[in-house]
Swiss-Prot record:
Interacts with RTP3 and RTP4. SUPFAM superfamilies: Family A G protein-coupled receptor-like. One of its GO terms (cellular component) is plasma membrane. Receptor that may play a role in the perception of bitterness and is gustducin-linked. May play a role in sensing the chemical composition of the gastrointestinal content. The activity of this receptor may stimulate alpha gustducin, mediate PLC-beta-2 activation and lead to the gating of TRPM5. InterPro entries: TAS2R. The gene is TAS2R16. The lineage of its organism: Eukaryota, Metazoa, Chordata, Craniata, Vertebrata. One of its GO terms (molecular function) is G protein-coupled receptor activity. Glycans are attached at residues 80, 163. GO terms for biological process: detection of chemical stimulus involved in sensory perception of bitter taste. It is a multi-pass membrane protein. This is Taste receptor type 2 member 16. Belongs to the G-protein coupled receptor T2R family. Most taste cells may be activated by a limited number of bitter compounds; individual taste cells can discriminate among bitter stimuli. Keywords: Cell membrane, G-protein coupled receptor, Glycoprotein, Membrane, Receptor, Sensory transduction, Taste, Transducer, Transmembrane, Transmembrane helix.
Amino acid sequence: MIPIQLTVFFMIIYVLESLTIIVQSSLIVAVLGREWLQVRRLMPVDMILISLGISRFCLQWASMLNBFCSYFNLNYVLCNLTITWEFFNILTFWLNSLLTVFYCIKVSSFTHHIFLWLRWRILRLFPWILLGSLMITCVTIIPSAIGNYIQIQLLTMEHLPRNSTVTDKLEKFHQYEFQAHTVALVIPFILFLASTILLMASLTKQIQHHSTGHCNPSMKAHFTALRSLAVLFIVFTSYFLTILITIIGTLFDRRCWLWVWEAFVYAFILMHSTSLMLSSPTLKRILKGKC
């Protein structure tokens, strides 16, 4: 049990972090969206950033409402918010993974014909790949939607005589739904790891070919991408830790530690959101022109 003053402190920190992320996401969407309307085209990285900004904006509001409903035991409201949070959470994971793939194919210096063909195909079909990530999210959220309906049914049956066999089956399916949500995040995480490893291999190759100490534009691009990927890796790892804590949550009072953990995780997400703003040449150029 932690002191109430400390709980309130971390609650305030979490809210401030969340509001900052919401403002940053809104700024990314507004600036790049205006640029899109003016020039009628955007680079693939800016397409990802707009999509990620919209997804993260919705995710952050859903996360705040979800956490407060969980803390104050508003179960009926929580059930309706959970499915929204899970949808945008999975979508954000996929968009982050696509961002690492873009960094990999754009910055890496591999010259193998298969890699060059993949680079050409991915860049050409990037809008369809974004749409595909949305469709994959819609499909993977189906078990969660069913589990959400089951959870509502369990809540309505709470004060009624229950059929123990039916209840056990419903609760078991709800556990499978949680496992399916975890698996849905593993695939983009593996995609992220593969892209990061390829990018690190490309950077190592560049260092071996340019050992004179001079930092050419290609090297700077590698370091910029790796810095963003390093922060993103921390965010991914932190989120998987939250899943682990959820699984072993019976070991301690999760309501007491909820705001401490949320403030810790969203500090990294705030760092990543800031890094995304700095990774877009279009966004930096427009913001510098406004100053």
